[in-house]
């Protein structure tokens, strides 16, 4: 086997959303990087819905931007509709979402990656890892040659032993139209990695010209919404479009009920577990039998195509049943299908063999990110890619790993969950997963995390200065307004007290007291308003975090023998040995570990220290 004559610092396998972020961040940190993908024309392909962001997910994209990653930038360049979800709810759960042009997303990502110094993009299919039993050495390809590297980042998506299901038919594939990767699964088994099976699916695509939009509800976008942190208001570079909302009918329900046995999911042909919060239409009909109809969202796939994505109609039914189901939906009576819906099963690696840095516990220098870790979603994958790419470089440079905490970021919440919990379904981020979500708002991601991005070399000094200036402005104005007393109603109160009233906005305060309120602009002003309006809750959460941190960050030695601590419950000994947490906080979040177990563990650690 011929070996390529360059020894890379980092080899990234797979150019999906995790792989692109990993390769970009590693190269930006000065590493020599190989990004290996089976097809250069599918880099950053949006395999499912043509959208980025949403509840929890939008928060993650803003955090990626604050750290110096690229998903936010590519989304803003490719966006054809921008919205803020949960606008009527509290600030912690408001989140940006964008419809993107899927072809332009790929084009912008590929063009950007091609311009990064030190990043070599190469077409080739990874077949096996090269290792010496303890450490990764590189990768061999299906084409018959090898690449050597100090570290390897594996971001294989749904390609590891991918199996596509359309009714009773199934066939090998990483996604429709792309071959599966068979060798990597076998190689990971050889190295002792515990593998499981998960399932996801995607709906059919339809021709827009065959749809009756007149019977549907139009869903336009919002103004001044974006993912990249800015000082000025955002104006999209592309023409903006609307989505449309329709619904299933009684006929839809009857068709699915009558043909349920022909579904790959309900016919017993799928062993993998699917995402709870993105169910197929047959799943919804069965589990919510009392509902007569379900919403369907028609989402355009781009400006230069007639294809639309039918959000809410994912299925693994045979194609003839899909045809009838689609035409039973209001407005889709004459719809022309361009691509069928399908389900896909794939292999993933259990989280107990991965450190929060995303390095494997079994083979040194091997990092895993994206759906191989059991997650679902472009945003979760990209965030893991950033962490894996950064820590691969840290490994090469013999620096400590970078792992943001769950108290300061949604990315930290995800890393902690993936490495302490037993996944029984694909992991998706929600704001409800964070204990301190009022501190983790999408508007303050830059103020929370930009110092990390700057110190890692990912965030420019100019952008870091912008975040620092925003933070300073908010702190100074909070302080000034708290000391500025004016008559409001019958009493004289500080202006911070006025802004705490639910009916008073920052803009109203600015209008009513123009001589006393500094105009910070709508973006920074909105953050100031939230900081003041929710200051009581924020203060309580910060106090709680400080009290927890005293025990949260107590380190656990790598060589600890849990089975020798007889006072631990049997379940605790088994699970702590399986997950090998690095801190008391991580140990406490492993399912099945009780408060009593943690107390026993802390006593044991204190004894050993003495």
UniProtKB/Swiss-Prot annotation:
Cofactor entry: FAD
A biological process from GO: tRNA wobble uridine modification
Location, primary (coarse class): cytoplasm
GO MF, one example: flavin adenine dinucleotide binding
Keywords assigned: Cytoplasm, FAD, Flavoprotein, NAD, tRNA processing
Record's subcellular location: Cytoplasm
Superkingdom in the source lineage: Bacteria
Pfam families in UniProt: GIDA (PF01134), GIDA_C_1st (PF21680), SAM_GIDA_C (PF13932)
Residues holding FAD: 14-19
Any coiled-coil regions, as ranges: none
GO cellular component, one term: cytosol
Keyword tRNA-binding: no
Amino-acid positions noted as binding NAD(+) in the UniProt annotation, renumbered to this chain: 274-288
Function (record text): NAD-binding protein involved in the addition of a carboxymethylaminomethyl (cmnm) group at the wobble position (U34) of certain tRNAs, forming tRNA-cmnm(5)s(2)U34.
Complex and partners: Homodimer. Heterotetramer of two MnmE and two MnmG subunits.
Similarity remark: Belongs to the MnmG family.
HAMAP family reported in the protein's UniProt record: MnmG_GidA
Entry protein name: tRNA uridine 5-carboxymethylaminomethyl modification enzyme MnmG
């Amino acid at each position: 086997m011929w070996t390529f004559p360059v020894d890379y610092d980092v080899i990234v396998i797979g150019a999906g959303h995790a792989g692109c972020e990993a390769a970009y961040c590693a190269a930006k940190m000065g590493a020599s990087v190989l990004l290996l993908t089976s097809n250069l024309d599918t880099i950053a392909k949006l395999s499912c819905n043509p959208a980025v962001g949403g509840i929890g997910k939008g928060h993650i994209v803003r955090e990626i931007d604050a750290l110096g990653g690229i998903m936010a930038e590519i989304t803003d360049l490719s966006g054809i509709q921008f919205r803020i979800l949960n606008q009527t709810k509290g600030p912690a759960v408001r989140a940006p979402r964008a419809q993107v042009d899927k072809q332009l997303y790929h084009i912008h990502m590929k063009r950007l990656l091609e311009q990064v110094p030190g990043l070599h993009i190469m077409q080739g299919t990874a077949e096996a890892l090269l290792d010496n039993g303890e450490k990764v050495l590189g990768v061999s390809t299906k084409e018959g040659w090898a690449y050597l590297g100090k570290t390897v980042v594996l971001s294989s998506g749904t390609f590891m032993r991918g199996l596509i299901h359309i009714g009773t038919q199934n066939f090998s594939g990483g996604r429709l139209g792309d071959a599966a990767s068979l060798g990597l699964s076998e190689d990971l088994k050889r190295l002792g990695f515990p593998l499981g099976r998960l399932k996801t699916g995607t709906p059919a695509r339809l021709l827009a010209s065959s749809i009756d939009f007149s019977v549907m509800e139009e869903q336009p976008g919002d103004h001044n919404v974006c993912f990249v942190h800015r000082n000025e208001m955002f104006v999209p570079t592309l023409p903006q479009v609307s989505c449309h909302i329709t619904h299933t009918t009684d006929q839809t329900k009857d068709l699915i009920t009558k043909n349920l046995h022909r579904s790959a999911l309900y016919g017993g042909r799928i062993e993998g577990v699917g995402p709870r919060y993105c169910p197929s239409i047959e799943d919804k009909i069965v589990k919510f039998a009392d509902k007569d109809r379900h919403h369907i969202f028609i989402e355009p796939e781009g400006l230069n195509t007639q294809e639309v994505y039918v959000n809410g109609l994912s299925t693994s039914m045979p194609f003839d049943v899909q045809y009838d189901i689609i035409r039973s939906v209001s407005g889709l009576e004459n719809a022309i299908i361009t691509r069928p819906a399908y389900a896909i099963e794939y292999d993933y690696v259990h989280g107990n063999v991965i450190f929060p840095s995303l390095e494997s516990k079994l083979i040194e220098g091997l990092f895993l990110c994206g759906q191989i870790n059991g997650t679902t979603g472009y945003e979760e994958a990209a965030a893991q890619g950033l962490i894996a790419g950064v820590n691969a470089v840290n490994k090469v440079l013999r620096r400590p790993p970078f792992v943001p905490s769950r108290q300061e970021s949604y990315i930290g919440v995800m890393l902690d969950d993936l490495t302490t919990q037993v996944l029984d379904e694909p992991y998706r981020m929600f704001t409800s997963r964070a204990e301190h979500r009022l501190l983790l708002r999408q508007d303050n991601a830059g103020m929370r995390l930009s110092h990390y991005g700057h110190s890692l070399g990912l965030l420019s000094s100019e952008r870091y200065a912008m975040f620092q200036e925003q933070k300073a402005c908010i702190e100074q104005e909070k302080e000034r307004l708290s000391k500025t007393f004016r008559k409001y109603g019958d009493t004289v109160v500080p202006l911070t007290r006025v802004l705490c009233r639910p009916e008073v906005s920052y803009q109203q305060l600015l209008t009513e007291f123009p001589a006393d309120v500094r105009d910070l602009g709508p973006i920074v002003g909105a953050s100031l308003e939230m900081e003041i309006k929710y200051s009581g809750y924020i203060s309580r959460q910060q106090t709680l975090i400080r009290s927890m941190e005293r025990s949260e960050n107590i380190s656990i030695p790598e060589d600890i023998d849990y089975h020798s601590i007889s006072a631990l419950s049997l379940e605790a000994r088994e699970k702590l040995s399986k997950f090998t947490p690095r801190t008391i906080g991580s140990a406490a979040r492993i399912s099945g570990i009780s408060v009593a177990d943690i107390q026993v563990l802390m006593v044991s650690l204190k004894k050993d220290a003495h």
